[in-house]
Amino acid sequence: MHSDAAAVNFQLNSHLSTLASIHKIYHTLNKLNLTEDVGQDDHQTGSLRSCSSSDCFSKVMPPRKKRRPASGDDLSAKKSRHDSMYRKYESTRIKTEEEAFSSKRCLEWFYEYAGTEDAVGPEGMEKFCEDIGVEPENVVMLVLAWKLDAQNMGYFTLQEWLKGMTSLQCDTTEKLRTTLDYLRSLLNDTTNFKLIYRYAFDFAREKDQRSLDINTAKCMLGLLLGKIWPLFPVFHQFLEQSKYKVINKDQWCNVLEFSRTISLDLSNYDEDGAWPVLLDEFVEWYKDKQMS
């Protein structure tokens, strides 16, 4: 009897312990919101329902949006943007290449006027002046010749052309046209003007002569001083009636100095100064002309 009672007590205690554990688990799950009332029958029978893993995940993370496939319009817009960017790139690249100086292009440009020769001659020079929109007698052509360091009037050799045009970064007619204003501006600088004036003497003279013939001298003086020296008309008149057939380089250089330093009434001219006889005679002739 005693052993039977003990066995009953043991089984009873085991059931109670199991019920206590189940009750504890139920309360724990309830705190975690993992249980729900699923109707009166479930409540009465004490049954439990835990949420599935997908239900729990949806409470934490928002639903993922599905990516829609690109429409035909979107693809067309992307292609249009790509084409536009490519055209812009190509336009910039081509423009850069055109702006960059090219020795090859400069050489081809030279032979447009030189033909099969190694120098641009009178005929080619005439066409060249026509293309850049400048008369051959325009002073800017003298400045260009100076920049090219041309040695003979009416001619540009291949070496002079390549060296000078490279320094100017001109390899086409269009580029030189846009450079003409710069070349003209060099005449406004006192130092550059003096260099160009001195260069003009050697450029214009016959290479087997040390002096410049009087007719060429009058033309070159008119080109350089005609618009900036008020006394040039009377000086030109003096040369016309004088006995001089040529002008040497010393006389040439002193004419520029005279035009810059001597007043229009010649009152500051020193007859005992180191002026050439040519200018002494001009001053005397001009004063006599004023008195008569």
UniProtKB/Swiss-Prot annotation:
Covalent link (Glycyl lysine isopeptide (Lys-Gly) (interchain with G-Cter in SUMO2)) residue numbers: K95
Any GO BP annotation: positive regulation of protein neddylation
Keyword Ubl conjugation belongs to the record: yes
Compartments, record wording: Nucleus
Comp. bias (Low complexity): 47-58
Region span, Disordered: 40-83
GO cellular component terms given for this protein: nucleus
Pfam families: Cullin_binding
Keywords: Isopeptide bond, Nucleus, Ubl conjugation
Tissue expression remark: Highest levels of expression are in the testis. Very low levels of expression in other tissues such as the heart, brain, kidney, liver, lung and ovary.
InterPro entries tied to this protein: DCN-prot, DCN1-like_PONY, PONY_dom
Domain of life: Eukaryota
Residues covered by the DCUN1 domain: 102-287
GO molecular function term, any single one: cullin family protein binding
Signal peptide: none
Subunit comment: Interacts (via the DCUN1 domain) with the unneddylated cullins: interacts with CUL1, CUL2, CUL3, CUL4A, CUL4B and CUL5; these interactions promote the cullin neddylation and the identity of the cullin dictates the affinity of the interaction. Interacts with RBX1 and RNF7. Interacts with CAND1; this interaction is bridged by cullins such as CUL3 and strongly inhibits the neddylation of CUL3. These CAND-cullin-DCNL complexes can only be neddylated in the presence of a substrate adapter.
Domain free text: The DCUN1 domain, also known as PONY domain, mediates the interaction with different cullins. The DCUN1 domain mediates the interaction with the N-terminally acetylated NEDD8-conjugating E2s enzyme leading to the NEDD8 transfer from N-terminally acetylated NEDD8-conjugating E2s enzyme to different cullin C-terminal domain-RBX complexes; the neddylation efficiency correlates with the DCUN1D5-cullin and DCUN1D5-E2 interaction affinities.
Biological role: Contributes to the neddylation of all cullins by transferring NEDD8 from N-terminally acetylated NEDD8-conjugating E2s enzyme to different cullin C-terminal domain-RBX complexes which are necessary for the activation of cullin-RING E3 ubiquitin ligases (CRLs).
Protein name from the UniProt record: DCN1-like protein 4
Provenance organism: Mus musculus (Mouse)
Classification lineage: Eukaryota, Metazoa, Chordata, Craniata, Vertebrata
